[in-house]
Amino acid sequence: MAYADAPRRTDGDPDGNPSVAAVTDVTEVSGRTGALHRIVIVGGGAGGLELATRLGDKLGKRNKAHVTLIEKARTHFWKPHLHEIAAGSMDIGVYETNYLAQSHWHYFRYRVGEMVDLDREQQRVTVAPFVDEDGDQVTPQRQFPYDTLVMAVGSLTNDFGTPGAKEYAISLETAAEAERFHRRLVNAYIRAHAQAESLRPEQLQVAIIGAGATGVELAAELHNTTRTLVSYGLDRIDPEKDMRLILIEAADRILPALPPRLSDAATKLLSKLNVSVRTSARVAEVLPDGVRLASGEVIPAELVVWAAGVKAPDFLKDLGGLETNRINQLVVLPTLQTTRDENIFAIGDCAACPWLGKEGAQVPPRAQSAHQQASHMVKQIRNRLRHQPLAPWRYRDFGSLVSLGEYSVVGNLMGGLGGRNLWIEGWFARMMYLSLYKMHELALHGFWKVTLDTAARVITRRTEPHVKLH
């Protein structure tokens, strides 16, 4: 590899040397005798950050291992809440976690950057130079040696190469994209209110491609927030007449990966909210001002959101000769080790993990599976340090919950009374839905900080607009 002969630092500086093209981030001087085990985690999503936090608390704090988290973003945000950022019903500044501060509080190292290469023989990860918003280089290309590598880079939406998708549709993969959609939505309403002429038919129409959990939750959330937005003085707009939401799904029902009863309940509620649901409708092209279906029908839209399909990042398919599947996920064993390297693990959406007990099935890419895998990885790494056998991970499916804005939450809990599925909705379902995020917060911050932050949010919420206006 081109970087194999990069100079090796021996002065203990963890940030590398900007005077060379590629530097090695070294946590100990040359010679491995008695050196601490080096754990490198790539990706600071739900699973990656929970793992780094827990390993830092258990190993880094006691100086039993060096724990490093590599992530290109500066702050962490729980991805299942992105639809609320897009709708404007949640302020990201209140809910995001700063990686640098988190690493300081929990005894791991955060290094900003994006992984671009892997040398399995030398056990080194290469991270590209980090460039800021102004195009200025902040850090050079660097290399990070590891003894245990955990890939937790998450997933992206999959546009399946659909023409126009990248150019004209907004995908909700990051908080920045969700905020971009929200700004465009607010601007569209202000523009419509201020224009001299009457609103054009379907001027404020939003097309959401993909009726999985993200698409369905976004549609329900937008129904409420757009009406709240109009109530703030944009009275030329009639939300019932001028604003339309269209949900487009290629499968024969919405929420196709979830139980039919949940899909039926969500369909009925969306109908009450005047959301137009188009199933068995495949998108052939995204246009500057709408969507063309495979049937030839054109659906006009001022804004198009792509929320269909899931794949792991493209760089994984050529990464160090590791085995991947057709959507770029790293294929792993029940121990969460990759099939071709026992020192490399993968968790979360980027891992194709067998579902033990379900022949031929894979664990679905959900927040609950990433949370469970992070907890299991803590045990696996501690076993590695003790030279003990690794245990297979068994996924526990606790069910599915879908939030339909302020109107309802519907879902099913697995293993209910008598070992059967338990259908839930209403207030109890909403409490269960909120508890999913609270579990993530507790894993990152602990009980007292979560309790105080929650109380502060409740107080602040009473003095702020219910919809973000910028």
Language model region names:
Residues A2-A4, V23, G34, K379-H470:
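C-terminal, flexible cofactor-proximal segment of oxidoreductases
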Residues A2-G16, V20-L36, F108-A207, V305:
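FAD-binding core/adjacent interface of flavoenzyme oxidoreductases
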Residues G47, G154-T157, A219, V310-A312, ...:
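Short glycine-rich anion-binding loops that position phosphate/pyrophosphate groups of nucleotides
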Residues A21-T27, E167-A196, D289-R292, V298-L303, ...:
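FAD-site-proximal beta/loop scaffold in flavoenzymes
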Residues A2-R8, G16, V20-D117, A213-L258, ...:
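Beta1-alpha1 glycine-rich phosphate/pyrophosphate-binding loop at the start
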Residues V67, R366-L385, L401:
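An active-site-proximal "capping" alpha-helix that borders the catalytic cofactor pocket
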Residues D15, K64, H106, Y110-P129, ...:
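A Rossmann-like FAD-binding core segment of flavoenzymes
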